[in-house]
Structures are given as C-alpha cells and as structure tokens.
Amino acid sequence: CLLADPELTPESSRRFIATVIAHELSHQWFGNLVTMQWWNDLWLNESFANMMEYVAIDALQPDWHMWEDFATNEVTAALRRDSLDGVQSVQADVNHPDEISTLFDPAIVYAKGGRLLVMVRKLIGEEAFRAGLKSYFEKFAYKNTVGNDLWQELELASGQPIVNLMNTWISQPGLPVVSVSNSHDAAILSQERFFIGEHQPSDALWPIPLFANQPLDVKILNQKETTVYIEKPLQLNCGLSAHFVTKYNESTREYLLKNITELPTLDKICILQDATILARAGFENSASLLPLALSLKTETNEKVFGMAAGALTELRKFVDDNDAARDSLKKISGEFARATFEELGWDEKDGESDDDRERRTTALSLMMYSEDKEVLNEAKTRFDNNKLEDLPTEIRALIISANVRHFETPEMIENLFAAYKNTPSNDLQNDIAIGLTSTKNPKTAEKILANIKDSNIIRPQDASRWFVYLIRTRESRQIAWNWLRENWAWVEGTFGEDKSYDDFIRYAATALLTPNELDDFRQFFEPMENIPALSRTIKLGITEISARVELIGRDKADVLSALQTTL
C-alpha cells in the first residue's frame, strides 16, 4: 500500500512509501527516457532508482537522515550478500530467459549497485556527477544504452578515469577487504577479496577509493599492497562512501573503538558494520561484539543505537541450544536497553524527535527479549485495554508480539486472525503478522502455515513475509522448515512463474544454523540446481548456512565465556 494516513501510519512506513514512490518516479529517467539495451545492464535502471530514492527523499525531508537509512539497510544487505562465493556481479550475463528473474537480487542489482553509484558520486563530486548525467540524458534520450555509455559521460564531466574504474566494480563479483597495518608515520594497505564461508581462491583486485580521514599520497588503491605516510591513526571509508570492509591492526582498532563516541554517525555505523561482518568471516572473534555494543548503550542516534543492538542480536545464534547462556544474553540485552527505555518511556512526548521514537522501539524490543516482568505486564495491560487500531503504531507490533509470546490463548489467536482479515490497513496487517509469528506454540505455528496457503486469509504476495517471520522465530524454525519441504509443490505452483520464486529458499538460508539443517537443505535443494531460476540461490544458500554452522562451532565457547564474564 502506498497510501499514508498522517495520524495512523508509523514513521517507518511513511519513509518506505516515500522511497518507493521516488524509486518508481526515477524510472521516468532511468528506464523510460533512457533504457538499457539488454538485461545484463539491468543495473542502469534499478541501481540508479535505488540511489535516487535516497537522493530525492533526503532533499525533501532532510530531518529523516535518509543516508543513515541507506547505510543500515542497503549497505548491510549488500555487504552480506556480496561476501558469498558464487554471488552475481552487478552487470551479469543472461544466457537463458529463466535467468532474468534471478537478476533482481535486491542486495546486488539494487543495494550494491546503488552503493557503487553513491561511491562514484562522492569520488567525482556533485557538480561533475550532475553534469555527466545531464549529458547522458541529452545524448541518449529515447535510446538504448550500455553501461559504458554512462561511464564515458561521467569521465568526460569529471576528467577522471571512470570507465576503467567502474567497469571493474560492476563486472566483478564480490568486494574487497582492506587490511591496515600502522606504524608511527606509515601504514601498509593491502587488499584481497572478502569472503564469508567456503570459497575458491581469488586473485581479484579492485580500484578502491580510500576516502581517508587525512590526505594520502594514494587516493585509490589499485594494487595488492602499498604504503602510505600518515599524520595520525588512519581511518578509511569515512562517510561509509565506498564498497569495502576495513580490517585494522589491533592498535588502530583500539584507538577507533576508544574514540567511537566522538565520530560522525556514518563513521560509527561503518565501524559497527565492519566489526560485525569481520566476525562473521572469522577475521575477528564474535565475542568482541559484546563490549563494542555495550560501549554504545547511551548512544542517542537511533541508527547507531540500533546497530549496537544488532551486534547483540548477532550473538543469539550462539545461545540457540543453551538455556543458561540464552538467559545471560537476555539479561545483558535488558541492561543495554534499560537506560534508554527509562529515558523515553512507553509514550511519545510532545516535540519528540524521529530518533527518539525509533530508539524507543529498539529499546523496548530488547526489554521484551530480556523478559522484564514489568515491561511484559504493561504490554499485556495495553493490549487488553485498547483496540489494535488505537495502540501506538511505532510499538504496536512489539505489544502484539509480547502478548502472543507470553500470554497466548486460543481466543487471542482467533481474534488476531480475524483482525488481520478484516482490516484495510496494510500496516496493521504487518504488525499482526509479526505478532502472530512470535508464538512459542507449535499448534499456532502450524495454523499460520496452513493459512499461508489460504488466499482468502493471506494474499499470495504476502506468503513469504509470514514464512520468513516464522522461520526466524527460534521455537518455530524447524516447523517452518519442515513445512517448506512438505509444501514445495505448492510454492512451485504458486510462484514458479514469478521473480519471487526463490524467496522461500533465500529466507530459509538466513535462518538455518545447525549441521543437520544444513544437511537437510543440501539434500532437498541440490537436485533443483539445474533450474535456472533457482540455481544461484540454492548454491548461495548452502554457502551461507555452511558459514553460519562453521562460525558457531568456531566462536561459541568464547561467546559463552564472554557472556558469563560480562554478568
């Protein structure tokens, strides 16, 4: 739904609606006025539209801080997907009609492609970027183009070697990690392809804009290794402007973490993102995320506070089968959020900022995860004494979830399904879906899965949303995974001709985390690898689950020890 009620639509939904409208309007230029010649240059349409969502809405609503949203949403998605061996490049060949649907990978042709355009915009400057686009549209109006046509216009406008630089980035899959080794007045920089999980050897190199915190004699790292002279501890990718991960040596890392509260917001997000994904890849121990997150518990910027909370959430996979350790993580999560929640309370105050509204949601989510009795009882009171439509929209999903999770009754479930079916509000429907899929009750999970196949209750286009919410809930993960395999013929019959056909596979791969689940995934989906629309998603799914299983085996003991020590 692209209609917003000023009184009822939550801030997050208003932002989403605005970006969707901006995305589609931008296709008047990127897609209609100038159109890609063939599907391999789909990014000329979608990567640009992705970037323009944020350019346009940031200009219209600067108080929304859209580039912080870009950093936490698009950049995070691009980093995680692009770190898997076998991922497609932004510009990808199409050898079979059924492969066209696979090009629409939201993390690559949308998020990564958009990020690469942000990178070149920052590299050449706004004036040259605008001039290059103006020339591109005038020269190719009502014509078909290839990627090189755009890069040539940007190169002419900027006087920089954009063609060679950007062709490497869009044609080469994956991303680099830049390792920084500092001495007193110099730093050795080296690059290699960044992987999470099993991978083939790679000698890939990128021309990497460094965007450093000080002038360097090398602005673009083109080679495997180089030395630069520095005046102070070196920080790279300032403003989160380029598509790479930075691994600092211990002394520089300690310096940045010690001073993280003094950094600009996007730099804080960059450090948190790098720390999280480096831990996933085994460059750092996942236990290091705990003190990093706790150091930011008084952060007032919602995106940074949310990223720190996300670092704590990363640790949940390590306590999946350990009740005592899970209780420890719950207590730590509650303590992380307590001061912020006590500051903001349950109810919005006059003149409250968007940041405070979003911080309240994040803090309340962690307080509920911690099973704070006072918070859960207040959630029950508010649920019992209000119509769903009257609950505050920013925290309504949390209130419903807390009640389903801790105070579920058969009548409650029936009433929520009835409300879902009868409400005209897409926002309320989504909040109910989040709430119902938080259940601990296997029978409720089974009822949800049965209703997914009933289009009179859940529309087919919403089916994967219910599924992903359910499979990411610890108590229902196995139930949802069994259902997917048992009902694959229905998935195939319902979505086989749609570009969302592989969504169920991709969502399952984000949640499965045990060796047995990995074996089951392989056994069930590997025979389908000859289906063009599914092949890449299946292979990437195996890599993703394998990496998660390996990560848990490698870091679990250290994470459990860190949890115990922190308490």
What are these regions (language model features)?
Residues 75-76, 80, 112-113, 183, ...:
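Long, ordered, helix-rich scaffold segments
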Residues 207-212:
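Short polybasic amphipathic segments
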